[in-house]
Structures are given as structure tokens and as C-alpha cells.
Regions:
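Rossmann-like NAD(P) dinucleotide-binding subdomain of oxidoreductase/dehydrogenase enzymes
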Residues: 1-124, 246
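Conserved C-terminal structural/oligomerization subdomain of aldehyde/semialdehyde dehydrogenase
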Residues: 80, 115, 166-169, 196, ...
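A short hydrophobic/small-residue beta-strand
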Residues: 30-32, 206, 286
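ALDH superfamily catalytic-core signature
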Residues: 54, 82, 90-226, 249-250, ...
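Residues that line or immediately flank small-molecule/substrate-binding pockets and catalytic motifs
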Residues: 8, 87, 151, 270, ...
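Glycosyltransferase donor-binding loop in the core domain
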Residues: 16, 38, 148, 184-187, ...
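Short, solvent-exposed beta-strand edge segments and adjacent coil->beta transition regions
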Residues: 2-3, 111, 142-144, 177-179, ...
């Protein structure tokens, strides 16, 4: 291809950089990497390691700075032949308007749904969904944001889920006893609380959490979410998950698909027919069976549909 501009987000500052550099270099290309403004150090260290290992200097350049300065210059430069971007939908749309006739790969956001059927193994489903919702403080494009639970087990699932969430220890993330640390900055924490408050004003119920101290937002569980509010249809990118009661698998799938995102979906069930029905009808790039949406290994295909990727 030639020169590839790789632009990465803050939430996985080493893994996502490696994802872009490895295939590009293996394919015989040179890369100009623009890591996230707030998390550049791991990218710089990885670049140092690659150079020390013998990578030719002109194969990789790392440029740090603000996206609206460095990123705009990179994506509009005619010498760059491909853009590889991971980040938010709005930033992705802005890049698309500036790149001209270049190849492009985009991994964007999501609002990941999980379906919990009444024939599932409830305990592991609860544990997996709690972990999937609050891992990385919810700052994860495949983190669990919506859970559609069959009405037969809704109350039991809810009680176990809320109880397990309340057990989470929050605080300094380098403390080994901490389950969940702060968000990337206080500005984002304020935004998350604003979305929660807006949902409550519209009739949603906050079962636990919903508060913050500085950039630390307590893990939050919601229910009775009105359709169309931000928490229902947009990507929160924070430690907030909403529970929904459904009567059938088809109802769960229909509601799962009723957003403009489609990265990962998941279903908990012991019925293989339910699993294959979800695989066929959920409008997402990947479906996880009997684990949460927050599952990905580096060797598996990964990508989304609708506003989740290109």
C-alpha cells in the first residue's frame, strides 16, 4: 500500500497500537503512528523496542500531539495511502470527510447487547456480565451496556447482578484489591453522570451507583430505561449498564438491533437453536455464546457493522 497513518485511542494504548503496527509492517508498509494524546508513552516505548530489535528507522514514525492538529495533517496528506483508525464515531466521520481517495479501515464505537435466556446457567451469566460491564471502567467498545433478560428469570438475575456490582471495590487502580478504578479524566466522569441524571429524569431507575468523586464513577446499574435516551441508544463509554425485561428471544433480538451500532453481541443459553437463531438475526460483527460481549482474542476476526466499523 505504501504509507499508512495509524490513529489509536486511549483505552488500550499498547494492544491497539500493536494491532495496527504488526499487520502493516508485515505487509511491507511504512507507518506513521498517532497515539492518543493522553496515553502516548506505551506507544513510544513499543516503537523503541521495535527499533532496538532491528526495525529500519524509516518503517515507523510516532508523532504525538492533539488530534485536531496532528491527525488532520496526517489524514489529508497525499503521501499517506491508507488510514487505520480506532476511536469514536464522530471522529471517524470527520476523518472520512478529509481523506480523499485513500484506503480506510475504521474500528468505531458500540452499544453492546447481551441476551440472557431462561435456560442459561444463571450464576456464570451474572458474573460474566458484571465483569463485561465494568472492566476498564466501561471504557471499552465491546463492554456490556444493555442486557436483555427473559422475564422468567429477570428478578433473580437483577438481584444477583446488583448484589455482585455492590461488591466491587473502587479506588486506586494499582491497588491489587481494587476491582475498578477511575475514568480517564474528570470531564468524562461528569458526562457519564449527566447521562445518568438525564435518564432518571425521563423515568429510568438507578438500582446502584450513579455517583462520582472526581473522575471515579461508581459502577452503575439501571432499569426501566425509556427508549431513545442517550443511555439506551448511544455509547456511554463508562461504567453504566441497563437491564431490560423481555418475553421472547425475538423481542430481545429486535431490541438489540434497534441502535445504530453493531460491533459485538452475546447470548447466554443452553439451547443450541437459540444460539444459532441469535447468530443469524443479531445485526453485529461478532456474536459470543455463553460469555459477555467483552471477549476478544488477538487472533480472531474483529470488526463491526452499521456505525461500529468500516
Amino acid at each position: 500500500i505504501g504509507i499508512i497513518a495509524a490513529i489509536t485511542p486511549f483505552n488500550d494504548p499498547l494492544n491497539l497500537v500493536a494491532h495496527k503496527l504488526g499487520p502493516a509492517i508485515a505487509g511491507g508498509n511504512s507507518v506513521v503512528l498517532k497515539p492518543a494524546t493522553v496515553t502516548p508513552l506505551s506507544a513510544l516505548k513499543l516503537a523503541e523496542c521495535l527499533l532496538e530489535a532491528g526495525l529500519p528507522e524509516k518503517v515507523l514514525s510516532v508523532v504525538t500531539g492533539y488530534g485536531n492538529e496532528i491527525g488532520d495533517a496526517l489524514v489529508s496528506d497525499d503521501r499517506v495511502r491508507m488510514i487505520s483508525f480506532t476511536g469514536g464515531v464522530e471522529a471517524g466521520k470527520k476523518i472520512m470527510k478529509k481523506i480523499g481517495l485513500k484506503k480506510v479501515g475504521m474500528e468505531l464505537g458500540s452499544n453492546s447487547p447481551v441476551i440472557v435466556m431462561n435456560d442459561c446457567d444463571l450464576g456464570p451469566a451474572v458474573e460474566s456480565c458484571v465483569s463485561g460491564a465494568f472492566w476498564a471502567v466501561g471504557q471499552n467498545c465491546i463492554g456490556v451496556q444493555r442486557i436483555y433478560i427473559h422475564e422468567d428469570i429477570y428478578d433473580e438475575f437483577k438481584n444477583q447482578f446488583v448484589a455482585r456490582t455492590k461488591q466491587y471495590k473502587t479506588g486506586f487502580q494499582l491497588d491489587e484489591e481494587t476491582d475498578m478504578g477511575p475514568m480517564i479524566n474528570e470531564k468524562e466522569a461528569i458526562r457519564v453522570i449527566k447521562w445518568i441524571d438525564e435518564a432518571v429524569e425521563m423515568g429510568a431507575a438507578c438500582l446502584t451507583g450513579g455517583t462520582r468523586e472526581g473522575s471515579l464513577v461508581q459502577p452503575t446499574v439501571m432499569e426501566n430505561m425509556p427508549p431513545g435516551v442517550k443511555l439506551d441508544c448511544q455509547e456511554i463509554f463508562g461504567p453504566v449498564v441497563t437491564l431490560y425485561k423481555v418475553s421472547t428471544l425475538d423481542e430481545a433480538i429486535e431490541k438489540s438491533n434497534a441502535v445504530n451500532y453493531g460491533l459485538h453481541g452475546a447470548i447466554f443459553t443452553s439451547n443450541v437453536n437459540h444460539a444459532f437463531h441469535a447468530i443469524k438475526h443479531m445485526d453485529v460483527g461478532g456474536i459470543v455464546i455463553n460469555d459477555s460481549t467483552d471477549y476478544r482474542v488477538d487472533l480472531m476476526p474483529f470488526g463491526g457493522v452499521k456505525n461500529s466499523g468500516l
